[in-house]
Regions:
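Short, conserved, GDST-rich strand-edge loop motifs in beta-rich repeat architectures
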Residues: 185-202, 248-263, 310-328
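Bacterial Sec-dependent N-terminal signal peptides
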Residues: 2-39
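Loop/turn-rich, solvent-exposed surfaces of beta-rich toroidal or solenoidal domains
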Residues: 294-370
Length: 389
């Protein structure tokens, strides 16, 4: 198996396809397993539960269970894959051991091959690899970025961004992207909870020179009304197209603060400022084939030629009393970044927030979905737009 074939998919609420908890059936064969499956099993409150990580074969359809699953922190950010290694984060709220854990694929199974101790309440969420021996780890809870060797799992340094915090000493560094020797870091600027100050519907990006590991500058969009650049747990919420233009998905305080909009901003190739000609507001935007308007992008994955696939959280589908990840209110869409349009993907029901994972694999998009009818992973043909049954 080629290293590039190790792919992450995630299913929420219950196991992919048929299983729904630790299953008494025999272990699922792991030969030729090259898809990493993270499974989330929330309790009714959505704030607690269990999570597992395992490898599965790329045979569809198939049934699986959690007997091969490795317990991982329930509230951790999505695991990050680099080659044959998978990096697992501690719980975002500090409800687990304070460490970054590395697992390596060996003969179709995952083996624990390293750990790196982290400070308490780090809320580590994202890794960017500068080289085989140098990586950056954002710690949203501390306002810092750790520099470490992903081979030895030893920290080598740290970048303190606390001076960029608004109303506190923490700008909440989130998802990151490396382009031309510069590290672009989304700053969520959350204050006293999950949202930024109401009077500041802005988007901030820190830019770091990776040759010196020093802050170059912070850039701010103050005019679009779009806020909270990148979703902390989604490494793909900041990405590049083939032109090397950077696109940033901003979650707009998750729709919880009046005057804050979700949207997409751009930093063009060769530039280190926001592109004033590209400010696409997602909040309230129309979606072709769908009667209700958009809220914010809960997950996104760029494919090519301006095309991306995403889940849009839809406030119009929230039922009384529903909130956050437990609401069945996320709609799968195809996005055209260049003409700023969205269309509904046929063949998928609304999902809760636990199942909204997108992965690229062998010319298809693997889409996690946790609806009222079924919970599993579906394959979408990029060329035809058809979804597996």
């Amino acid at each position: 198996m080629k290293i590039r074939n190790l792919t992450l998919a995630l299913a929420g609420t219950a196991l992919v396809f048929s299983a729904c908890e630790k299953d008494p059936d025999p272990k699922v064969p792991a030969d030729n397993a090259n898809i990493a499956l993270a499974t989330i099993l929330p309790n009714p409150d959505g704030m607690t539960g269990a999570a597992y990580l395992q490898l599965i074969r790329d045979e569809f359809p198939q049934n699986t269970n959690n007997n091969n699953g490795i317990p991982i922190p329930y509230e951790g950010a999505y695991p990050v894959i680099e080659g044959n290694d998978i990096f697992v984060f501690p719980g975002y709220m500090g409800d687990s051991k304070n460490e970054l854990v590395k697992y390596t694929r060996v003969n179709g199974r995952l083996s624990k091959t390293g750990t790196m101790k982290l400070p308490p309440n780090s809320s580590a969420t994202n890794i960017v690899f500068a080289s085989a021996e140098k990586a950056y780890l954002s710690m949203a809870g501390l306002g810092r970025i750790a520099i470490f060797n992903p081979i030895t799992m030893v920290q080598k340094g740290e970048i303190d961004l606390s001076s960029l915090g608004v109303s506190d000493n923490n700008p909440d560094p989130s998802a990151m992207l490396l382009r031309d020797g510069l590290l672009y870091v989304g700053l969520s600027q959350m204050v006293g909870g999950w949202v930024p100050p109401q009077d500041r519907p802005y988007s901030d990006i820190a830019i770091i020179d990776t040759q010196t590991d020093k802050l170059l500058k912070m850039i701010t969009d103050k005019t679009s009304g779009i806020s909270m650049p990148t979703r902390p747990i989604d490494r793909y919420s900041i990405f590049m197209d083939e032109k090397k233009d950077i696109y940033i998905s901003c979650v707009g305080a998750f729709g919880m603060v009046k005057g804050h909009n979700a949207g997409i901003l751009r930093i063009k190739a060769g530039e280190t400022e926001f592109d004033p000609t590209y400010r696409w507001t997602i909040t309230g935007a129309d979606i072709s084939g769908e009667e209700k308007t958009a809220g914010f992008i809960s997950a996104i994955r760029y494919v090519n030629n301006g095309k991306a696939y995403a889940y849009i959280n839809m406030p119009g589908y929230y039922k009384p009393g529903e909130q956050g990840h437990t609401a069945i209110a996320d709609l799968a869409v195809e996005i055209n970044l260049y003409d700023r349009s969205m269309k509904k993907i046929k063949g998928l029901d609304l999902s809760n927030g636990f199942g909204v994972m997108l992965a690229l694999y062998k010319g298809t998009v693997l889409i996690g979905n946790s609806s009222t009818k079924a919970k599993g992973i579906y394959s979408l043909n990029i060329q035809t737009g058809e979804v597996s049954k």
